[in-house]
Structure formats: C-alpha cells, structure tokens
C-alpha cells in the first residue's frame, strides 16, 4: 500500500488503541468512553449537549455513554445552580483517577512512539500536526 498520511494515522491509531486497551480494562472503561471522561475532566460542569459536540458524537450515543459512565461511577450529573432545567456533568473520585490515568497513558505512548526523535524534531512534528488540525479541509474531512 502507498504510504500516505492516512495510512500512518491508521497505524498509529491501531497501535494506540492496543496500547491502552489492557490498562483501560483494569479501570473498567473503554477507549471510546475515556474520551468522554477526558472532556468532562477538562471542562467540569459541561452539559451533555456540549459534551456530545466536543467528542463529535450524536446526542443518542452521548446519552447512552453518559448513562453508562453514571452507572459505572465515573461521573455524576447535577442540576445547574442558576438554570434548573440544565444538567451539568462532573467527574467522581473514580473518574478523576481515570482522567489522571489517561493523561499518563497518553504521555507514555507518546514517549514510546517518539523515542527515536530528537527534541527539536518532536517540536517540529507537533507544530505541523497543530497546523494540520487548524486547516479547514481537515475539519471538513472529520465531519463526513
């Protein structure tokens, strides 16, 4: 197969998924649900609708995911103090622990994958990835 950016991103995604799988099983959470925990950890007090938009999930999938995270004790849902019609999501202690674990897992994987690069090369790589992430075309592809 021709070596394209899509090829490499697919390979890295598969590798990252396999790397995380066993550690996440110990935490009792899937990689898909972990992204919900990460967003709530970064934006405590977010709404379910905001969460769905941020992780690019439809509202039905987001609702099922939130229910699963509630049942498994990773998050809690409360009424907004000022707008009682709105519910806000926050992490529980278990969720906080998982959020911290995710942070260390992501850095551990980065360290392993990028170990052959010099510091300057890593900076260049991240600069290029950030530039790609900001392009209009990249976002259009992600929405399809």
From Swiss-Prot:
SMART domains: HTH_MARR
SUPFAM superfamilies on file: Winged helix' DNA-binding domain (SSF46785)
InterPro entries named among the record's database cross-references: BilQ, HTH_MarR-typ, Tscrpt_reg_MarR-type_CS, WH-like_DNA-bd_sf, WH_DNA-bd_sf
Highest taxon above the source species: Bacteria
Domain (HTH marR-type): residue spans on this chain: 1-134
Keywords from the UniProt entry: DNA-binding, Transcription, Transcription regulation
DNA-binding region: 48-71
Molecular function in Gene Ontology: DNA binding; DNA-binding transcription factor activity
Role played: Transcription regulator that regulates expression of the bilirubin reductase operon (bilQ, bilR and bilS).
PANTHER family attached to this UniProt entry: TRANSCRIPTIONAL REGULATOR, MARR, TRANSCRIPTIONAL REPRESSOR OF EMRAB OPERON
Name of the protein: HTH-type transcriptional regulator BilQ
Species this chain originates from: Clostridium symbiosum (strain WAL-14163)
Organism taxonomic ancestry: Bacteria, Bacillati, Bacillota, Clostridia, Lachnospirales
Gene: bilQ
